[in-house]
Amino acid sequence: DTIRDGHPDTPIVVISPIICPAAEDHSGPTLPNLDGRFDVVERPDELTVGALSLERIRELLAIVVVQRRAAGDSNLQYLHGHELFGAADVDDLPDGLHPNSAGYQRMGERFVSYAFAPSGPFGRPVA
């Protein structure tokens, strides 16, 4: 709200988390195992009530953006993180959580293609 109050017409893109196979349907925290790969810490059921998996975080972010757009904020966009780095990209998560340089490069290229396309949030319509 603070950003939007000061900049009502500025395009804002809410990007949900990219893929992390260990945390897609399990809540965190994530910690590195002995191999240096990140896994979620299993917790008793009573400690998982209300905890957020990546899938749930994406759902909630999408809902908030839809609500804000319905309330008149047409400059707010939602981008599912899998559009930038999804299931086909997991080989570029050497520790299971963080992309390597090739993964970050691909994410940047995909974001530019999305955001600066003529119909994208930062694009300029072709006259």
Where are these predicted regions, by residue range?
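Oxyanion-hole/transition-state-stabilizing segment in secreted/luminal serine hydrolases
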Residues: 1-13, 17-27
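A structural signal for short secondary-structure junctions
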Residues: 6-8, 70-73, 85-86
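Conserved beta-strand termini and adjacent loop/short-helix elements that scaffold enzyme active sites
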Residues: 15, 79-81
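Short acidic/His/Gly/Ser-rich catalytic and metal-binding motifs that mark active-site loops
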Residues: 22-26, 85-90
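Substrate-gating cap/lid alpha-helix
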Residues: 24-79, 106, 123-125
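Histidine-centered active-site loop/cap adjacent to the catalytic His
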Residues: 94-127
